[in-house]
């Protein structure tokens, strides 16, 4: 849900999954796959992207600028070495004011975008920084240079950045380190008789989902209920995927799953 909330408020702007560096390497491909089918436009780990059949996406790192020494030298080195298929998106917040480094980059190479990853301790108002950089780029004839933002972004910080003129986002920690959902597996029926420990609801339950408004309902009745909001007959939310250790439903391509998720997200109220 953390990803879906970010996707919802980002609108149609591109959003790249940057969360694998906050996760154990063994689950990085799984995290990237979940991020992609959940609505991200791309993923940043090489293995995760390969398993999705897509190229990995990202920008130049701060480490390159720090090792080269001068931002402009690093921008030119990045441009010289990277293939033409790699977007020229460079970091513009390593040493100097963001607008100064952004203009220097735009003057040095054929730039696609700048990325601002300014630490929160140095930001002040991040939306105001974005507006200032956008103004200066436009003023100096670089209207086609985008502004990609990253660094602790979530569903509360993205909306004002959209209004400020952001071109896209790299979202990591709020996806990969999202709070867990508290749940437990409990015995609720014994030989057909409902039982439960205190604080739990006894009895075998069935869950249903409305195909229109996407509402959920849990019932002990076998009768399929009508949606309380729109009146349409609901559908079982539980689908058997495996039987006797074997998958019994066809495997869907990640693109097909992502398309369905985004279609449902467009109708969902979060």
Q: Which residue ranges define each predicted feature?
A:
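Gly/Ser/Thr/Ala-enriched C-terminal appendages of enzymes
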Residues: 124-145, 153-270
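Buried, small/hydrophobic-residue-enriched core segments of structured protein domains
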Residues: 1-143, 155-160
């Amino acid at each position: 849900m953390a990803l879906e909330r970010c996707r919802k408020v980002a609108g149609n702007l591109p959003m790249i999954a940057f969360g694998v560096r906050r996760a154990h390497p063994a689950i990085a491909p799984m995290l990237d796959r979940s991020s992609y089918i959940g609505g991200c436009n791309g993923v940043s780990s090489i293995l995760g992207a390969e398993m999705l059949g897509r190229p990995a996406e990202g920008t130049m790192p701060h480490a390159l600028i720090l090792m080269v020494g001068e931002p402009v030298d690093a921008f030119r080195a990045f441009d010289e070495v990277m293939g033409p298929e790699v977007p020229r998106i460079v970091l513009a917040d390593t040493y100097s004011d963001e607008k100064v480094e952004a203009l220097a980059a735009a003057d040095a190479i054929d730039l696609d975008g700048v990325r601002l990853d300014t630490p929160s301790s140095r930001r002040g108002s991040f939306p105001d920084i974005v507006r200032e950089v956008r103004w200066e780029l436009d003023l100096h004839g670089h209207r086609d240079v985008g502004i990609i933002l990253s660094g602790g972004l979530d569903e509360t910080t993205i909306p004002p950045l959209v209004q400020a003129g952001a071109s896209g986002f790299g979202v990591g920690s709020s996806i990969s380190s999202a709070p867990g959902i508290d749940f437990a597996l409990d015995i609720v029926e014994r030989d057909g008789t409902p039982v439960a420990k205190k604080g739990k609801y006894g009895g075998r339950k069935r869950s249903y989902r409305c195909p229109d408004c996407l509402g959920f309902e849990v019932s002990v009745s076998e009768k399929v209920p009508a949606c309380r909001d729109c009146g349409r007959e609901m559908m079982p939310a539980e689908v058997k995927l495996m039987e006797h250790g074997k998958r019994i439903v066809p495997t869907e391509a990640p693109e097909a799953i992502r398309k369905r998720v985004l279609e449902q997200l467009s109708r969902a109220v979060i």
